[in-house]
Amino acid sequence: MCDDDVAALVVDNGSGMCKAGFAGDDAPRAVFPSIVGRPRHQGVMVGMGQKDSYVGDEAQSKRGILTLKYPIEHGIVTNWDDMEKIWHHTFYNELRVAPEEHPVLLTEAPLNPKANREKMTQIMFETFNTPAMYVAIQAVLSLYASGRTTGIVLDSGDGVTHTVPIYEGYALPHAILRLDLAGRDLTDYLMKILTERGYSFTTTAEREIVRDIKEKLCYVALDFEQEMATAASSSSLEKSYELPDGQVITVGNERFRCPEALFQPSFLGMESAGIHETSYNSIMKCDIDIRKDLYANTVLSGGTTMYPGIADRMQKEITALAPSTMKIKIIAPPERKYSVWIGGSILASLSTFQQMWISKQEYDESGPSIVHRKCF
């Protein structure tokens, strides 16, 4: 079906960033925000060639005059027209390829609605005329990238966090847990606690500034109470950040209070369990015989696991929950921000995977529901 000389395209559409590139590469060629921006004001300069919408980095750079929208919320596509724009931008502007010449591997969140992947399939074949495509589950790809076939993946991105136990390459659906608490919620929370300090951030453009503060300055405390005491008694934890207009702000205990919400969702007014408890609950839903392997292979993946200190804190929290003799190992690969994409690149270039693609012919015969039979 698929010639060896044509590289497959791997597109990992995250809620926050889109990662795209060619199968067989060790990193994505294009990484850009999953944003579509539309002008807030009428264009007045004639002949300026203003567009009615901007995608990705261009939207980001013109954010002052645009309203920014994320078409993927909590890992699920909520606006298909905008999603199509992002894919179009990915193929034609970022990768500069003709999608009708390459098989495309897409990714999706676990426990995604079935209609969501059908629609993805339909758009790929009908709008972009791809010769073949496949939809893979993000967490499974992360595990591939870490060189394992058994383990539990805590995948936390911008829109959704999930814990996915995988045994010998099979995700165990009954034990997958999903937590709608991720990077975007932490950004919103940081906006809120910075407002309490007297800095006001409200617009969609300012939210992007706060996201940058979060990525550059936040970290996870090993002992939250102790860290709060340290922050209160000295200024050793304070850092300054220069805003785009040159104003300098000081950030103190917000640096670790923001990601602490991952472990204590009550900070955000949520009743759910933290990421440590969710991982533990997920392991406990698995067969007793495989738990040992899961505890010893807990893999972190996604941008929201990039905070310094998060692996040590997870180790501490899970050790407290697990049986006392259990060996617990948290694996936090340095490239975990892109491990979903890397796993996709590995998968799509395996010779054994080539018969797994859904071909245009199969799609024409069966329609979009083919995706449930071929991708699992």
UniProtKB/Swiss-Prot annotation:
PROSITE patterns: ACTINS_1, ACTINS_2, ACTINS_ACT_LIKE. The modification N-acetylaspartate is found at residue 3. It catalyses: ATP + H2O = ADP + phosphate + H(+). This is Actin-2. Actins are highly conserved proteins that are involved in various types of cell motility and are ubiquitously expressed in all eukaryotic cells. The keyword Hydrolase applies. Residues 1-2 form a propeptide. In this organism there are four genes coding for actin. The sequences coded by genes 1 and 3 are identical. There are a few variations in the actins coded by genes 2 and 4. It comes from Caenorhabditis elegans. Pfam families: Actin. CDD domains: ASKHA_NBD_actin.
